Design a protein with these regions (language model features):
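C-terminal alpha-helical "lid/dimerization" subdomain adjacent to the S-adenosyl-L-methionine
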Residues: 24, 169-228, 234
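Conserved alpha-helix/loop element of class I SAM-dependent methyltransferases that forms part
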Residues: 36-39, 46-66, 81
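Hydrophobic beta-strand segment of the Class I
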Residues: 37, 137-138
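A short glycine-rich, Lys/Arg-flanked "PGG" loop and its adjoining helix->strand segment in the class I
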Residues: 150-162
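Core SAM-dependent methyltransferase catalytic element
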Residues: 229-258
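Class I SAM-dependent methyltransferase SAM/SAH-binding core
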Residues: 67-126
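N-terminal auxiliary segments of SAM/dcSAM-dependent transferases
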Residues: 2-28
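A short acidic, Gly/Pro-enriched loop at the edge of an enzyme's catalytic core
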Residues: 125-136
């Protein structure tokens, strides 16, 4: 069923905005798509987003605090999947968009997970947690929406225990020419039209396409993780490389990986 749309909004390209403008734009965009966010994620990815999250959670190791920090949690899908696979853990979900947090809380209440998952408002670039308090810090499809990615990576590294993991799941614009042409057509032509049938702010999905196309290639992002102080950095292509799973480890205080 189509929804009533608001007046068509336009957003500047990611590469042409300041960090402050980027943060404000992200809050505005995601505040307008919360009610249909889960449906559109599943629909537009042909439900591959569910499989990708499962793959990310399978790589998580909980050995000390038994706690996961889900950064840019959105409506909490990564947090919920983590609890499904690791019933012994507790999850803290953090997001900068109040409307997303509200939807996330409703979801976990319906699933009777309020005692296992908590949500709070917060900025990934200034995490409100002490050092060394989570086994894993993860973020699914959110790192590209953060203006200062190196700072967010440093913060995620800071709050995990020595030997803990930073796990990133993010979309990728393929480099293979033929696949790139098809994906460009999908992102810039097909996706906005499909989203427009269901979203009251279809322009948000133009931003989605733009943010994917301007995200660093896997080799560059993996290097960014190393520069943030993470070790044993891995990058794994999923579904022909349209999504990548990145894993990094916080070294111990002697600089060694546990």
């Amino acid at each position: 069923m189509a929804v009533k749309k608001q007046k068509m909004q336009k957003y500047r390209q990611v590469s042409k905005v300041t960090s402050t403008e980027h943060s404000r734009m992200v809050r505005e965009i995601f505040a307008t798509i919360t009610e249909r966010y889960d449906f559109l994620n599943h629909f537009l990815s042909l439900r591959r987003d569910i499989v990708w999250r499962r793959s990310a959670v399978r790589e998580m190791h909980f050995f000390q605090s038994k706690r996961l920090l889900d950064v840019a949690t959105g409506t909490g899908d990564l947090a919920i999947e983590a609890i499904r696979q690791h019933p012994e853990i507790q999850v803290m979900g953090l997001d900068i968009v109040p409307e997303m947090v509200t939807i996330g809380r409703r979801k976990i209440e319906k699933k009777h997970l309020s005692g296992r998952i908590r949500f709070m408002l917060g900025d990934a670039m200034i995490l409100p947690f002490p050092d060394d308090c989570f086994d894993v810090a993860g973020i699914a499809f959110g790192i590209r929406n953060i203006p200062d990615r190196p700072q967010a990576l440093r913060e995620m590294k800071r709050v995990v225990v020595p030997g803990g993991q930073v796990i990133i799941l993010e979309m990728n614009f393929p480099r293979h020419r033929l696949f790139r042409l098809f994906y460009d057509l999908y992102l810039n032509r097909i996706l906005p039209v499909m989203a427009g049938a269901f979203s009251r702010n279809p322009a948000a999905y133009h931003y989605l396409a733009d943010s994917i196309m301007h995200f660093p290639p896997p080799v560059e992002f993996a290097a960014m993780m190393r520069e943030a102080g993470l070790t044993a950095v891995e990058k794994h292509p999923l579904t022909l490389g349209i999504t990548y799973l990145y894993i990094g480890v916080k070294p111990d205080r002697n600089g060694l990986q546990k």
